[in-house]
Regions:
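Charged interaction scaffolds used for protein-protein
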Residues: 1-68
Length: 68
């Protein structure tokens, strides 16, 4: 997935999980992107959507990878 595509996913997750500690800065964004960029965008998008629809708390990187 491309960086701009990941940005879209982060915006969606931040809208659903309005917690200031969830991916709080550029450094955190870079770590998350580095660990998820190998996933195809569509696969990551579906995993994020599934998590947002079924979980009360924000995902971890592992949660997204497991659902992908």
């Amino acid at each position: 997935m491309e960086r701009e595509q990941f940005k879209v996913l982060v915006k969606a997750m931040k809208a659903v999980y309005a917690q200031p500690t969830f991916i709080p800065d550029q450094d955190a964004f870079n770590v998350w992107f580095a660990l998820l960029r190998d996933l195809p965008y569509k696969q990551a998008e579906l995993a994020v959507q599934k998590h947002m629809a079924t979980e009360k708390f924000p995902p971890t990187i592992a949660d997204i990878r497991e659902k992908a």
